[in-house]
Amino acid sequence: MAQDVIANGGTPEIGNLATPINSSPFTRTFINALPIYRRGLSSNRRGLEIGMAHGFLLYGPFSILGPLRNTETAGSAGLLATVGLVVILTVCLSLYGNAGSGPSAAESTVTTPNPPQELFTKEGWSEFTSGFILGGLGGAFFAFYLASTPYVQPLVKIAAGVWSVH
């Protein structure tokens, strides 16, 4: 007897299909543990966690791979570039939340059966955006501080040497 690999996960017309990847327990647990879908978080806290991750992770590529990578100001340039991008992302989030009637309501899918409804209102999105900029700037400054400590500085020099052109 043949077994279907892809099952209908709701409305097939919009592509909500249950595949072995998106309906596996591992994938569902992983996706639902992310701050955007985790239960019990306020919109501001969601933005704070997501912004912190973005600010922290964007600092490294800007400081190590940026145009000033082989200078003494590589760390400062990376910090300023990260702050600039976080501000641009915050403006984009704010524009998205204020355009039209606000962010569209999240629909339940196979992977995320209970999306947070309070986030997808104008007020919730505004709180998310304010948390995002605070977390993003905090993450960037923390990464800058961490990369300038004497314990991490040798690792920064190794990483900069890997991607430098001599």
Swiss-Prot record:
One GO cellular component term noted in the UniProt record for this chain? photosystem I reaction center
User: So where does this one cross the membrane?
Assistant: 77-97, 128-148
- Tell me which UniProt keywords the record has, alphabetically: Membrane, Photosynthesis, Photosystem I, Thylakoid, Transmembrane, Transmembrane helix
What compartments host this protein? Answer: Cellular thylakoid membrane
Topology versus the membrane: Multi-pass membrane protein
GO-annotated biological processes: photosynthesis
Does the record bear Membrane in its keywords? yes
Q: Which HAMAP family match?
A: PSI_PsaL
Q: What protein family is recorded?
A: Belongs to the PsaL family.
**PANTHER family, per the entry:** PHOTOSYSTEM I REACTION CENTER SUBUNIT XI, CHLOROPLASTIC
The protein's name is Photosystem I reaction center subunit XI
